[in-house]
Swiss-Prot record:
The UvrABC repair system catalyzes the recognition and processing of DNA lesions. A damage recognition complex composed of 2 UvrA and 2 UvrB subunits scans DNA for abnormalities. Upon binding of the UvrA(2)B(2) complex to a putative damaged site, the DNA wraps around one UvrB monomer. DNA wrap is dependent on ATP binding by UvrB and probably causes local melting of the DNA helix, facilitating insertion of UvrB beta-hairpin between the DNA strands. Then UvrB probes one DNA strand for the presence of a lesion. The gene is uvrB. Residues 630-665 form the UVR domain. ATP binds at residues 39-46. This is UvrABC system protein B. Residues 431-597 form the Helicase C-terminal domain. It comes from the Bacteria.
Amino acid sequence: MSKAFTLNSDFKPAGDQPEAIRRLKEGLEDGLAHQTLLGVTGSGKTFTIANVIADLNRPTMMLAPNKTLAAQLYGEMKEFFPENAVEYFVSYYDYYQPEAYVPSSDTFIEKDASVNEHIEQMRLSATKALLERRDVIVVASVSAIYGLGDPDLYLKMMLHLTQGMLIDQRAILRRLAELQYARNDQAFQRGTFRVRGEVIDIFPAESDEIALRVELFDEEVERLSLFDPLTGHVLQTVPRYTIYPKTHYVTPRERILQAMEDIKVELADRKKVLLANDKLVEEQRLSQRTQFDLEMMNELGYCSGIENYSRYLSGRGPGEPPPTLFDYLPADGLLVIDESHVTVPQIGGMYRGDRARKETLVEYGFRLPSALDNRPMKFEEFEALAPQTIYVSATPSHYELEKSGGDVIDQVVRPTGLLDPIIEVRPVGTQVDDLLSEIRLRAAINERVLVTTLTKRMAEDLTEYLQEHGERVRYLHSDIDTVERVEIIRDLRLGEFDVLVGINLLREGLDMPEVSLVAILDADKEGFLRSERSLIQTIGRAARNLRGKAILYGDRITASMAKAISETERRREKQEAYNTEHGIVPQGINKKISDILQLGQSANKGKGRGNRKAAEPAARYELMTPKALELKIRELESKMLTHAQNLEFEEAAALRDEVQVLRAQFIAIS
């Protein structure tokens, strides 16, 4: 029987959470396809979803709008479900330049990519968990709608080994080569195997800390054991083990041969079309490139850019959707879309950009028309394939509300009793001087201020003006990378400065309890940055403070302002009524400042053996850029292997633990 979800938390549902959990569960059990959870900032939406997952015991996919929020969700879910499979599935590219052609300058840009091995391992681990068990939560980015290997072919390619089975050594080695594992008797690493007499050591592609030892005796599997690849220490013997392919795109030989025949037929047809239109250069280019790919596929079983032939390799017809992570999710799975007002439009936008680039490649003879089927899912395909869905947002868009039939589950009351900010509207004419006096009031009592402007120029001028008047102020803009952004937010919370000025400070997941004032300049200028949703999100940044307040500077109240003010007041009234009825006194949030830099670090909680020395030195690396972190990880891995070769296993294990902590930090900030 499959393992059940076990929720680990010191807290019990409170505020609006019990009612939200009950209604979401009832809706799912009644077969509702779409539900919306409208949860205000700081109301514990993730905890509510965790309770629903634990009670229903169904495999779940959680979609987040970006890698940073995905890492944050992954870390939270790891803490809630330490005994279950919580997996992470985001794009494994540190850098990606797709192939493209610019006709105006006759420039062809080759595909160039840098793959993050650790994230690739986590992706393989995610699909393995979905295929093997039911107690799975996969936290994914929009990468989940991009093409992946066909799950049926992936399952067919697996190598099952059981104790006592009859199989000779050569057959095992041949199968490992088909799974794209490489033999390496010197450097034993993920996705490789080594042979020593009748003993084969295999390092599974989806694992980062356990390897398999297969001991043969006269064409019979005598023993299967799991061991630590670093120390060689045997952890346990197992009666059976399944080895998964090294990549999601592995394909059986017979399917490759069939695909090659289909590609030849398409090439002949396409050449006729190009010649009929006097496109001789394009015909020559297409023939040369495709023939080269066919030769490589025949010799090696794959070629560079093999994903462009995915229609034939997965056996799908023209125009059919590609296999994606959704094909690995069981039919009764659950989909949770976090920050749905941002994530849903992202899903809709991916297909069009990809299509425009590929059409140019096809038109100018760089690719066959079938390459157009190597694409992300269309929005309609996503809708058709998505299982029962819960949309989670503080500001759901019309799409979610329409899909849920207007039946929105409110989670307005916070367990802490905190109220939504008080809102004031003040004239634009004196906004800068008025803001300066408000900042001084807040700075005097060690509180922080967020200021949002409409343009970059205004943000720069305001920052300069405030600095001239002796205020400690910093400016946040789009050129700042994720790590530096996290550093600035951390410094604001620590009190290194008092005021943060920016243009788009409504960023979801910006969690700063020290901020007691949000000032929105030119709030009466209708547009994207001053829409109802943007205003509510920005006002919500002051909702984690006991004295939270939002000042909207405008000479008139626009429709968006009126809606945002009315919605905030509705929430505040409901919160006050609940607090009065239950005798709750609002409490401020004391969130550890280090937390914001440790997204996903809990991922490694409970792994490995012995004392974790890694947590101590990790602080030294908190402010490193992703590139510097990657170099540090490589340096530590090199030292670790040196210690292992010198049989200094204690030192090697300590470095291994430190590398794992740094990898988790790298995921969080990349």
